[in-house]
Amino acid sequence: FFNLNGADVLIVGAGKIASRRASVLADFGAEVTVIAPEGCTAMRQLETEGKILWKHRPFTLSDLDGRKMALAITDDASLNMRIAKQGKEKGILVNNAGDKEQCDFYFPGIAREGSLVAGVTASGADHHLARTVTEKLKEWMETQKSEK
């Protein structure tokens, strides 16, 4: 895991997947900036709660300046590819949600109970399996908590 406390993270896109990732990153202390003209209800809620900074406009190259990480999560494959390429050129860790070959890291499913945190990934190959294992871990963590 990375220490994300105070890390400057860019998310381009504001759909359901982007909102889930923004929420997790913010919960781990990242300073999350979202770039997208429009987005889903969950992203609007994160903005209302002050968990993210949302710039309601299209992506520009300068949006990558000074970032630790950049996540390209739009429905435009060519834009995601451009963000990943330009981010790598700037030395930023990038995740292109639509192309695992362009990812410097995979975004895991997170199971968290108090100070215990587990991340599950199938290296971008099987999202359903990773989600299933994450849910089982969450259930197990709950049973451990209730047994104490």
Model-inferred region functions:
Residues 16-17, 77-78, 124:
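Residue-level detector of alpha-helix initiation sites
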Residues 47-62:
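Glycine-rich, highly charged phosphate/nucleotide-binding loops
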Residues 111-148:
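Adenosine-phosphate binding glycine-rich loop
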Residues 1-46:
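Hydrophobic, well-ordered beta-alpha structural blocks that scaffold small-molecule cofactor pockets
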Residues 32, 54, 91-94:
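Hydrophobic beta-strand scaffold residues
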